Design a protein with these regions (language model features):
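Rossmann-like adenosine-cofactor binding region
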Residues: 44-47, 60-65, 179-275
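Phosphate/diphosphate ligand-binding glycine-rich loop within oxidoreductases
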Residues: 48-128, 143
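Glycine-rich NAD(P)-binding loop of Rossmann-like domains
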Residues: 104, 128-162, 171
Length: 321
């Protein structure tokens, strides 16, 4: 009997575009979905799957769903972490799990961070609208510059460090905080280590680059957002759980902060009536931080490699520990 492989959430139509599936399709039936599936529609789609390919953590795979997939033999996900996958439930059924490599996603996310900073700081959406409405410059075209401003980085890993280097090139001061930050580590990239409260009080732009965990959930709540300058901008290309979304919406609507650029959301795709769609001075992107051709080339080729090995009865490639 031919195996059935289901590929979920290929929004970008990238799998077949960026890799060769001919050997897999010769040995198995493959169905690729480019729109999200939910509830009974998702269950009906997955019921006959022998192998399942997940794009990051776009579709949750909890134990309650896994228990209903009696034919499931193998799971592959892109990237190296999947917070929406119940790995324990799969391992309990001895279903192997593979993952791909990342590719240059940190470069992509750092670039997007700066695109959002500059887009919001220079009010590029509003300036573009002037021209599409047959207008020219107005009072909102008198724009600030970055030199001499302070960038606050919450987290200074590989992405945060890249963002810091660009800020210094613009002549900005960089301050940073994380639970394990040391003055020496901050100094190594030309930044100053401060407390979280000091960072929020001092920064003209605050950008999040910290790992999501139980201790960082809701890190920026109503109390913390109230510490920010009234014209300060908040940038989040990390994880939505780091910020209390309701508190952010209130802060934007009440104009207690200057604006926000957001790439990550509590539920994705973003629902049509989400309040962030209507908040002032808000720039939204559809979770593009890791969405770059070199990254997806690594994803798709890794998936093909894993599936070919599985179909040929070879040892699992890049098994999840």
């Amino acid at each position: 009997m031919r195996k059935k492989i289901i590929v979920l959430d290929d929004y970008e139509n990238s799998y077949e575009k960026l890799s060769d599936w001919s050997k897999i399709k010769a040995a198995a039936d493959v169905e690729i979905f480019n729109q999200p599936l939910y509830g009974q529609e998702l269950l009906k789609t997955l019921e006959k799957a022998h192998a399942l390919v997940l794009m990051r953590d776009r579709t949750p795979l909890p134990a309650s769903l896994i228990d209903q997939l009696s034919h499931l033999e193998y799971v592959v996900f892109t990237g190296t972490r999947n917070l929406a996958l119940d790995a324990a439930a799969l391992k309990q059924r001895n279903i192997p799990i593979s993952h791909t490599e990342w590719g240059p996603s940190k470069d992509s996310t750092a670039e997007l961070t700066w695109a959002l900073i500059l887009g919001l700081h220079k009010r590029l959406v509003e300036q573009n609208q002037l021209l599409t409405q047959q207008a020219w410059r107005n009072e909102h075209s008198l724009l600030p510059v970055l030199k001499g401003r302070t960038l606050g980085l919450i987290g200074l890993g590989e992405i945060g460090s890249r963002v810091a280097k660009v800020a210094l090139a613009f002549g900005m001061k960089v301050v940073t905080w994380s639970p394990n930050m040391t003055p020496a580590r901050a100094d190594a990239v030309g930044a100053e280590s401060v407390s979280l409260d000091e960072l929020l009080q001092q920064s003209d732009i605050v950008s999040l680059h910290i790992v999501a965990s139980a201790t960082t959930k809701g890190l920026l709540n109503q109390e913390k957002l109230a510490l920010m300058k009234k014209d300060a901008l908040l940038i989040n290309t990390s994880r939505s759980t780091l910020v209390d979304t309701h508190a952010l919406v209130v802060a934007l609507n009440d104009r207690t902060i200057g604006g926000a650029a957001i790439d990550v959301f509590d539920a994705e795709p973003l629902v049509a009536d989400h309040p962030l769609r209507n908040t002032p001075n808000t720039l939204l992107t559809p979770h593009l931080g890791f969405v770059a051709q070199p990254v997806f080339e690594s994803f798709t080729k890794g998936v093909v490699e894993c599936l070919e090995a599985w179909l040929n009865g070879q040892p699992v490639i890049r098994p999840l520990p």
